[in-house]
Amino acid sequence: MERYDKATLNAAFAPEFRQNEGSLTSTLRTLLFFTALMITLPVGLYFSSKAYIFEGTLGMSNRDSYFYAAIVAVVTVHVVLAMFVYVAWSEGTRQWREGKQD
């Protein structure tokens, strides 16, 4: 049996670990970006569309503006989710293709 020291083992597994670490960092960064979008964008668009578009520009009542602003927020959530699925799918197929070429 051969004995391996730590330097030899680290040199053997370092490129694979670095590739996985980069992939994990990229995935985490994407997830955090879309999490921030999912929290801020629908809430921000809800209040801004309610105040500036529906009540301010269109002159709707307070009750009607709640309803239409909620629709804007729900549509925004669906758009952000669709964007996340597209980016995750593209990133996954890119990583799969890179793995197949090795």
UniProtKB/Swiss-Prot annotation:
**Membrane-spanning intervals of the chain:** 31-51, 67-87
Keyword entries, A-Z: Cytoplasmic vesicle, Endoplasmic reticulum, Membrane, Transmembrane, Transmembrane helix
Q: Where in the cell is it found?
A: Endoplasmic reticulum membrane; Endoplasmic reticulum-Golgi intermediate compartment membrane; Cytoplasmic vesicle, COPII-coated vesicle membrane
The record ties this protein, via Pfam families, to:
VMA21
Organism superkingdom: Eukaryota
Which regions of this chain are Lumenal-facing, per the record's topological domains? 52-66
Q: Share an example GO biological-process annotation for this protein.
A: vacuolar proton-transporting V-type ATPase complex assembly
The free-text function statement in the UniProt record for this protein reads:
Required for the assembly of the V0 complex of the vacuolar ATPase (V-ATPase) in the endoplasmic reticulum.
What name goes with this protein?
A: Vacuolar ATPase assembly integral membrane protein VMA21
Q: Which gene encodes it?
A: VMA21
